[in-house]
């Protein structure tokens, strides 16, 4: 029912939000039905220790999106009994028939159960899925968000809200400035450094990465940055995280050390940084003298025929 109603299948267990896709896992009453290593988990609960969505939300894990069917399911005695009978028939059908008469009996029960499933159980469960409370972490989705959405649309609205709620800093790199592919990243790494960049304020994404680097008690590699900013609350794509690091290097706040070589040119960075992220260590940059900066600015003005730099 869940697979059909929400389009929730192993072949569609990824959801894209901001700059990357996330693995989606699924549980029915704690039993895994989808993905073993998920970023987010969708739970369908027909039983729980409380029938209060608010109380259940209080102990819910942050990355879990819950369709809390129990608060409605527990009050529908007819559905509960029919579902129990249906499950019993399925168990009975698995038993080996010891006679032709018993086999006929099994077929009769199976046909009745199939009819009950199609006419009663399935429609009512679909209705529960479309009307039950939905919980994202410790927040109950407001009706203003869910609206009158049904079926796959309701699931899409809920999972999008959940990803927004969980990865609240994903939008920091969801902009045209940031590369979407490795080739775009390489092109941006190879761009010449304009002198004005050194005086421009840091972006919010750059501030986050710089703060992480400044607080780290040990050497940090580009791979460490990628892992850290793929986590909650960021959820950044690898290319975006590497781009932010590289912008801090271009500002001369940090420098790369590649395979114990501190003198790394842009071409080597562009060619190798994605593949060898664990071999690129990020170190504080050495101070540049004012004379060198002035000479660089004068050379840049001469090359590009610029009279002054504001």
What spans do the regions from the language model cover?
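Extended alpha-helical interface modules used as scaffolds for assembling large macromolecular complexes
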Residues: 1-310
């Amino acid at each position: 029912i869940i697979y059909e109603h929400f389009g929730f299948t192993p072949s569609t267990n990824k959801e894209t939000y901001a700059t990357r896709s996330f693995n989606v896992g699924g549980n029915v009453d704690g039993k895994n039905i989808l993905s073993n290593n998920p970023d987010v988990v969708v739970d369908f609960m027909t039983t729980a220790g409380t029938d209060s969505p608010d109380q259940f939300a209080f102990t819910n894990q942050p990355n879990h999106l819950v369709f809390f069917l129990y608060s409605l399911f527990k009050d529908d005695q007819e559905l509960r009994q029919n579902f129990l009978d249906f499950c019993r028939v399925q168990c009975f059908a698995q038993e080996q028939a010891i006679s032709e008469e018993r086999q006929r009996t099994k077929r009769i029960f199976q046909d009745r159960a199939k009819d009950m499933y199609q006419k009663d159980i399935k429609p009512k469960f679909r209705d529960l899925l479309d009307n039950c409370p939905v919980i994202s972490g410790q927040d109950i989705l407001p009706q203003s968000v869910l609206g009158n959405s049904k079926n796959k649309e309701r699931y899409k609205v809920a999972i999008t809200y959940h990803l927004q709620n969980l990865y609240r800093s994903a939008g920091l790199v969801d902009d045209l400035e940031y590369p979407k592919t490795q080739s775009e990243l390489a092109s941006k790494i190879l761009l010449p450094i304009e002198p004005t960049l050194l005086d421009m304020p840091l972006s919010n994404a750059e501030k986050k990465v710089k703060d992480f680097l400044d607080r780290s008690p040990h050497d940090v590699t580009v791979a460490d940055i990628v892992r850290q900013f793929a986590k909650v609350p960021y959820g950044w794509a690898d290319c975006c995280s590497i781009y932010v690091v590289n912008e801090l290097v271009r500002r001369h706040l940090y420098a790369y050390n590649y395979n114990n070589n501190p003198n790394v040119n842009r071409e080597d960075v562009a060619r190798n940084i994605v593949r060898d992220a664990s071999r690129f260590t990020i170190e504080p940059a050495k101070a540049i003298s004012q004379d060198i900066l002035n000479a660089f600015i004068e050379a840049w003005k001469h090359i590009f025929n610029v009279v002054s730099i504001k």
